Amino acid sequence: MSKRYLDDVLSPDTGTSDSDSSIENLNADNYRIDIVNDNARRDDIDRIQSSNLNHEPPYNLEGVFAIDDDEHGDEMVRKDSDRRQDITEDNDDSFVPDITTPPRERKRVRFGINEKGGDEEFNNVSPWDFKRLIRKFYKEQLPDTYQIRNWKRPSKDMLTNFIDLIENNIELASEEVFKQYHQELNQLYPDSEEQAKLKDSLENKVFDTTYNIKKRLKRTKVPSKIWVDNLNMEYIYAKGESIKKRYKSELDRAEAIERQLIREEEHLKSLQEKGETQAKKRKQVLSKELSELSKTMHPSLSVALSNTFGLIKDDKMSNEIYQQDKIDFNLKLKTDFSKPLISEKEENSLNGLTNAMDNNRELVNEIFGKISALLQPKKNSNE
């Protein structure tokens, strides 16, 4: 059977079928990728440029490789056969044009594309939307030259400290409120237990709100890095002028303080000089008065008087009289005043003797009083 099929294929009298004639009449150049007609090329370029304007991929692959589903398999076979012929055939007259790629759209740098309008975003902010509230407050308080670059979650220590400050004041605040409205509470809730329950319920509600605040604060972000725009010439000039003015004011203030210190030093020196001159004058006046008094007074009194006025120093206090008496009367002091003169036993014995003498004196006084009392009535009876 296989031999019969080979004979039919190799025989020259076999007729061509309709399918073979249709394939021969087709122009393979119309289905080649490397040879493109001018009109089709313009249509493809216009289609690609319009797609680029709508921010789609730079190449419209579906437009370039648009093939019907029914003819997809046959055309792929023809294209493969055409490529093989181009590779095998060496024809100098055949011209294959270069593949032209459509021009790409240049990348454009767009700043703040993901940022919303500042005023419109923060016009109506919910009080529980902490994320937007924090951004709004930072935007209002920071100057225009400051820009926040990075945002991060708040730390646990920051959150715990903030919540502790609120929770520690809840009980104190509730007590102050109940004290302030004590009369109204007594009218509405005369029972103390009901007031206590009301207080507990209010405190629990406040604690619940603080818990919700903590949960929402965990989701917020705070700025971690700020960039200062120092390239604004007006800002740099204004900042330089303010620094100059402040530096000048500080210099003037320092000079004023120095001048004040110099004046105070001069005043102190003048006071010291006045004090020294007054002391010298006072000493001269006192010495003159003492010299006049010493003429009419005893020499020992004049020395004592001069000592009372402080004109004689302690080093110059003389004991000439004592030394003279010591020589005249042969005085010798053997006692050591650094040690106690009497021992404890002697002191105790002396104390006992003094007590006994005091007791004896009291007895003598009592006896004398009794005797005098007995003698007085006898005198009256004799009379």
Curated annotation (Swiss-Prot):
GO terms for cellular component: kinetochore; nucleus. Residues 244-274 form a coiled coil. One of its GO terms (biological process) is meiotic cell cycle. The keyword tRNA processing does not apply. Its main location: nucleus. Residues 350-383 are annotated as: Interaction with NKP1-NKP2. Residues 11-22 have a biased composition (Low complexity). This is Inner kinetochore subunit OKP1. It comes from Kluyveromyces lactis (strain ATCC 8585 / CBS 2359 / DSM 70799 / NBRC 1267 / NRRL Y-1140 / WM37). The gene is OKP1.
